[in-house]
């Protein structure tokens, strides 16, 4: 996997690609984690990750001659290419008893080269940033990019080894990245229940003692639930109905996929998915053991739930940001980005547009059409230029998908990068939320908070919140718009970030229903917002830190070995169960029981949402 260069990307001339495609000076700046400017250091890796986010189609295996109906018309058209076998191969990574390939990769480097203290410090920063980032498609791609960046930064010159090309060869997949950094979170040390103080530091005794057996068993049960849910939704992408092997029934799919949007009915669990059914049915017992608001795990003296603490921290961060906004925007950003590199600041928004246009958006525009065309062209060009190399150097379990009949499925979109990995749509909403991806940029995080306040305060009467979204969005589209409310809290007012229209473009592309779902209805979107820790994810407020300060911070993170989430795993168990039930509708009695129990858990966390019943039945 990470052996010498004969296992890495081979150039056109047959020589070793020892540079890995990195720009000169790519590894010179101190690593800070989730830095949008890093994407510009290796365009080849960006193309590779976009390619690896798409499914592969192959011709279905023909039936044995003795099974063919003798009366069948020999002139029938051959079956269309299918992604079913590829989906099955990818979904295998989400089994609980499969090795984490990211952990295995790190272990291979450790055994072959040793892990330097500098690498450990950088990796600790990456882990900290992913725990503070919103789980979304762009975050998954960024985590993959920066994982490769760190391995090459420390081992490309020293070991003449590069991870560039590993995702194209399917040695690693974006599903492995999601599992390691966002689903199971192999490096997490809090057992799924945030125990950190408001300052973000770990209790010394807890950090020293680590997790007990009971904590790890309970967290493994949670991990099985979320991985099984993700796997079940991924398997719905297979475009053939289930047979006697018990695979999931395919769901008519896609905003722009191979079928019409699905407006009713649910998927069907087959016999092989009965363990997933059992896990979903027992979600409440699973959540109870990893719920910060429950009697089993509430810490003595705790007065705030994880959600209340996260909201309080966000409010305080926004107050600090706005108190230094003029100085910060006038100097620090410009110093950090320097002249002609200002556009790199919006790299995550541009990546959102590229990945999600026409696969997770409803309102078409010239920019979304061009972005969708660019994504398809990127995938097709990468496949055309690397196909020969990949045919002789691809992971064995994916070797079938580089044969002569294999072709990337560009119509379905970057399914493997998305959080929920299905392509179903309902009520003008899609599996991947555009607004969740916007949160990765500080200015857009702030703009979304202001936008929500403007929607809530738009009318002093009892106007429907849904009806308030369009006029607020329309007012924001006017460059000379005035604040919509006199005083709607800190940072109130209808202002937009100066991002050359990126924020408005993506908000319009998402559509009113998707905005409404994200802001007020969907438990997954609500948790994504709360999980995002701006004081950790974004660069510090004020002047950029000195390189020595950055290195000291990373060393502290590595030595403390305290990696805690912001939202307790019990709420994530609820959210994943909710999203799975949107695709696989439970029976009425089970559905009513779930809505009741989910509502109680959300109320205990003081997390108000509009009508879980409506969201469950009308959105995805």
UniProtKB/Swiss-Prot annotation:
For region Zinc finger 1, the annotated ranges are 100-186
A single GO cellular-component term on record: host cell nucleus
- The residues the record assigns to binding Zn(2+) 1 are 100, 103, 180, 186
Which Pfam families does the record cross-reference, listed alphabetically?
Herpes_env
The segments labelled Zinc finger 2 in the record are 433-525
Annotated residues for binding of Zn(2+) 3: 306-307, 568, 605
Single annotated GO MF: zinc ion binding
Q: What broad class describes the main subcellular location of this protein?
A: host cell
For this UniProt record, give its keywords in alphabetical order, as a comma-separated list: Host cytoplasm, Host nucleus, Metal-binding, Zinc, Zinc-finger
Q: Where in the cell is it found?
A: Host cytoplasm; Host nucleus
**Positions bound to Zn(2+) 2:** 433, 436, 518, 525
Q: Where is this region: Zinc finger 3?
A: 306-605
The record's comment on protein family reads: Belongs to the herpesviridae UL32 protein family.
- Annotated function: Plays a role in efficient localization of neo-synthesized capsids to nuclear replication compartments, thereby controlling cleavage and packaging of virus genomic DNA.
Q: Know the name of this protein?
A: Packaging protein UL32 homolog
Q: Give the organism the record lists.
A: Equine herpesvirus 1 (strain Ab4p)
Instruction: Recite the lineage of the species.
Output: Viruses, Duplodnaviria, Heunggongvirae, Peploviricota, Herviviricetes
